[in-house]
């Protein structure tokens, strides 16, 4: 089996969570949360992550409504994914991320998080969950 490295992003207008993982174990590790202004990150930070991890594919969470319809944040997340692809020529896939932030908050709470998400964000935990969910739907082939 060929090992693949994937980088996942949980897009947000104030913060963008990041996680990296590899296909041999289908697990992911959180990376530092990336500050954003109106959904625009410091592109040098994104570039540094891409250079460090050299992912085969980037997964960007798509924050669909519970009924599966798209919203304004979906449009912005797609724009973010398109910019990554356009700037860095890496394949990008959008992936349904419904309820990952809620699950990330629950996991953080179980580990003692005090609920102050502005000072202690869970966006990168959500990115890890996005990547792990992606692997459950796209298991590697031997």
Swiss-Prot record:
The molecular function GO annotations come to: nuclease activity
- What superkingdom does the record give? Bacteria
Cellular component per GO? cytosol
The entry assigns this protein to a family as follows:
Belongs to the YqgF nuclease family.
UniProt protein name: Putative pre-16S rRNA nuclease
Q: What does this protein do?
A: Could be a nuclease involved in processing of the 5'-end of pre-16S rRNA.
Per UniProt, the keywords (alphabetical) are:
Cytoplasm, Hydrolase, Nuclease, Ribosome biogenesis
Q: Which NCBIfam families match?
A: RNAse_H_YqgF
Any one of the GO BP annotations: rRNA 5'-end processing
The compartments listed are: Cytoplasm
- Keyword Cytoplasm carried by entry: yes
Transmembrane region(s): none
Asked if Cytoplasm is a keyword of the record, the answer is yes
Q: What is its EC number?
A: 3.1.-.-
């Amino acid at each position: 089996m060929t090992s693949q490295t994937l980088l996942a992003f949980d897009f947000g207008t104030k913060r963008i969570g990041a996680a990296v993982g590899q296909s041999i174990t289908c697990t992911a590790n959180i990376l530092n949360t990336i500050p954003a202004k109106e959904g625009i990150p410091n592109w040098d930070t994104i570039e540094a992550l891409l250079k460090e991890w050299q992912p085969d594919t980037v997964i960007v969470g798509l924050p669909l409504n519970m009924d599966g319809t798209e919203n304004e944040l979906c449009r912005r997340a797609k724009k973010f994914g398109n910019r990554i692809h356009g700037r860095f020529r890496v394949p990008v896939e959008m992936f349904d991320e419904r309820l990952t932030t809620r699950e990330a908050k629950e996991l953080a709470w179980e580990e003692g998080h005090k609920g102050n998400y502005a000072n202690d964000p869970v966006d990168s935990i959500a990115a890890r969950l996005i990547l792990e969910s992606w692997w459950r739907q796209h298991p590697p082939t031997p």
